[in-house]
């Protein structure tokens, strides 16, 4: 009896994975307003919610749960994007935060440590890495008023569940600042294509569930100022992390992306697998400031704390002296092989999307036969760079 092999999806993807026609059909969908009954409108396939109604729903458990359920469906199975109008209704809170951010940008420029951008050309914008902590330390009262917004909390919990981890980065796009390259985002979106392809296919489905992207508008943003370009439904295309850099996908994005004008205090949230990028600021006199929220699942962490630096120091002489070991396997069990979280002010990416890891430095030291004392100084310097 001949057995038929099961029709299984591929265990790994590659640079050619993903059918363009399938992608085109997915992003050609039209949103059905019946799927988002709590939205006040649907504009260009993106559901729009009223901030006052969100605040009211947050105070009633059943309404809160219904809203989060609707949002979870939008992020996973709908457009992947939602807007909360007047999510931070008190403009004095936004204005004070903007003043804090302007001062931080000025101070960091004077110190020559202003943040670069992973997807934009140098000079197009000003960045504040870790604006969350810097904002909190500069003005704790304003920080508390800012992050007390129900829309931020409900969107984060709708996608990630409780105990999420908030991070934030300010992006101020300068007059004439060019658009970002359209992309997917953290985690897999911060890797080279070759590195992405090393992760099994099911991880390409997991990555979007570990992060939520958000933005707080700090000024009015007509389309000419370059609000975020978004491609609704694109998070539904499974192979997108590897496929979206191909020319036909980039061309389709350029012809079909959506930009919605925003007002000060509006909130935008989207699945990190949505193809997106900051738009070109076509104005000559308007600085477009947003605070980008990158919220992470509590599940993106190991169960135990491990002092990997101490382990690497102990193992380094063994790895140098012992023959017959499968060194890569030992490195994988010991050294920190992932570059995040890190301090992007003191440990910025050089020649790529992410900084070098402890495992990278260990491999490099072993290959070069680096003396212990010299390598240990490298480890100590890396630990210092990673601190906030």
Regions found by a protein language model. Give the residues of each.
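Flexible loop/turn segments at secondary-structure boundaries
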Residues: 90-92, 174-176, 222-224, 237-238, ...
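Short conserved micro-motifs at the rims of enzyme active sites and ligand-binding pockets
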Residues: 95, 227, 241-242, 280-282, ...
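Extracellular structured ligand-interaction cores
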Residues: 81, 165, 179, 209-215, ...
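Fe(II)/2-oxoglutarate
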Residues: 1-76, 333-341, 345, 349-388
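Non-heme Fe(II)-dependent double-stranded beta-helix
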Residues: 27-193
């Amino acid at each position: 009896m001949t057995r038929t092999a099961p029709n299984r999806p591929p265990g790994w993807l590659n640079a050619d994975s993903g059918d363009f026609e399938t992608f085109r059909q997915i992003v050609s969908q039209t949103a059905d307003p019946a799927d988002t009954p709590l939205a006040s409108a649907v504009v260009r396939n993106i559901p729009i919610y009223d901030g006052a109604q969100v605040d009211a729903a947050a105070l009633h458990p059943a309404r809160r749960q219904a809203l989060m359920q609707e949002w979870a469906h939008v992020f996973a199975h709908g457009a992947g994007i939602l807007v909360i109008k007047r999510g931070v209704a008190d403009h004095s809170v936004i204005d004070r935060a903007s003043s804090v951010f302007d001062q931080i940008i000025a101070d960091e420029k004077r110190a020559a440590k202003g943040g670069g951008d992973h997807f934009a050309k140098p000079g197009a914008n000003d960045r504040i890495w870790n604006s969350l902590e810097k904002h909190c330390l500069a003005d704790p009262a304003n920080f508390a008023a800012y992050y007390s917004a129900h829309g931020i909390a409900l969107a984060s919990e709708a996608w990630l569940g409780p105990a999420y981890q908030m991070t934030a980065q300010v992006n101020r796009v300068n007059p004439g600042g060019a658009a970002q390259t359209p992309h997917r985002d953290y985690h897999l979106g911060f890797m080279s294509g070759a590195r992405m392809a090393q992760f099994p296919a099911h991880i390409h489905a997991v990555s979007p569930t570990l992060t939520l992207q958000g933005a707080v508008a700090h000024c009015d943003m007509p389309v000419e100022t370059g609000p975020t370009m978004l491609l609704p439904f694109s998070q539904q295309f499974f192979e997108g992390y590897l496929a979206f850099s191909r020319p036909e996908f980039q061309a389709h994005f350029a012809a079909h992306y959506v930009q919605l004008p925003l007002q000060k205090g509006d909130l935008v949230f989207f699945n990190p697998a949505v193809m997106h990028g900051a738009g070109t600021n076509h104005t000559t006199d308007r600085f477009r400031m947003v605070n980008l929220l990158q919220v992470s699942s509590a599940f993106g962490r190991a169960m135990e704390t491990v002092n990997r630096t101490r382990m690497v120091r102990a193992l380094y002489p063994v790895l140098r002296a012992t023959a017959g070991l499968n060194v890569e396997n030992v490195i994988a069990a010991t050294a920190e092989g992932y570059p995040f979280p890190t301090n992007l002010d003191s440990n910025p990416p050089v020649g790529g999307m992410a900084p070098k890891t402890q495992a990278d430095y260990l491999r490099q030291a072993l290959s070069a036969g680096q003396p212990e004392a010299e390598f240990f100084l490298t480890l100590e310097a890396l630990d210092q760079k990673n601190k906030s």
